Amino acid sequence: MGSGPRGAVSLLLLMLAPPSCPAADCPAPCSCAGTLVDCGRRGLTWASLPTSFPVHTTELVLTGNNLTALPSGLLDALPAVRTAHLGANPWRCDCRLVPLRAWLAGRPERAPYRDLRCVAPPAVRGRLLPYLAEDDVRAACAPGPLCWGALAAELALLGLGLLHALLLVLLLCRLRRLRARARARARAALRLSLTDPLVAEQDGTDES
């Protein structure tokens, strides 16, 4: 009977404890201990970063890698995460960083992330990630395929506009020439009509 209350308390604590990550769910090359996933100092980049982590992860360590951004939705898929260690990474604060900036903006505490700074591009170099406005991040975006496509479309429209303007100028010049010729012919016909009676009268005078 004496062990009954202690057994009940132990069972309750076991039920309340967060589930640990099975070894099979621990992504390579990280190491896992309980709900802690340690991927720090593994030389990870955007391309080599694991695409997913155990859903019960409460602490994620990504410190000391070569990460310039995180894939969209990576942290949002971990609702149990209380802390993500992201320091000592060369964060590039452009379009790719928008998801991470949004995730940081939604954290109740920003103090653990105040050492995160932008390394590039030059416009935002040295700025603190948690206090970076989304407009600042988007303004630093390099032109993507859509931007280049829109630019090409604008240039094509500009070229068509210039071509139409050139054709219009040529048409106006042609019309002016035709009008000038018509006026010249009209003046010549008028002169001819005025000189014909004089010639006829002169011929009649000569005959008499």
Curated annotation (Swiss-Prot):
Domain called LRRNT: residue spans: 27-55
Membrane topology: Single-pass type I membrane protein
Keywords: Blood coagulation, Cell adhesion, Disulfide bond, Glycoprotein, Hemostasis, Leucine-rich repeat, Membrane, Phosphoprotein, Signal, Transmembrane, Transmembrane helix
Modified residues (Phosphothreonine): T195
Coiled-coil regions listed: none
Localisation per UniProt entry: Membrane
Membrane-side (Cytoplasmic) residue stretches: 173-208
Chief localisation class: membrane
Glycosylation sites: N66
GO biological process, one term: blood coagulation
Start and end residues of each LRRCT domain: 89-143
Stretches forming LRR repeats: 60-83
Highest taxon of source: Eukaryota
Record-annotated disulphide pairs: C26-C32, C30-C39, C93-C118, C95-C141
List of residues that carry Phosphoserine: S193
Endpoints of the signal sequence: 1-26
Pfam family, one: LRRNT
Chain ranges on the Extracellular side, renumbered to this chain: 27-147
Membrane-traversing stretches: 148-172
A GO CC term assigned to this protein in UniProt: membrane
The protein's role, per its UniProt record: Gp-Ib, a surface membrane protein of platelets, participates in the formation of platelet plugs by binding to von Willebrand factor, which is already bound to the subendothelium.
Miscellaneous note of the record: Platelet activation apparently involves disruption of the macromolecular complex of GP-Ib with the platelet glycoprotein IX (GP-IX) and dissociation of GP-Ib from the actin-binding protein.
Subunit structure comment from the entry: Two GP-Ib beta are disulfide-linked to one GP-Ib alpha. GP-IX is complexed with the GP-Ib heterodimer via a non covalent linkage. Interacts with TRAF4.
Protein name as catalogued: Platelet glycoprotein Ib beta chain
Organism: Papio cynocephalus (Yellow baboon)
Lineage, top ranks: Eukaryota, Metazoa, Chordata, Craniata, Vertebrata
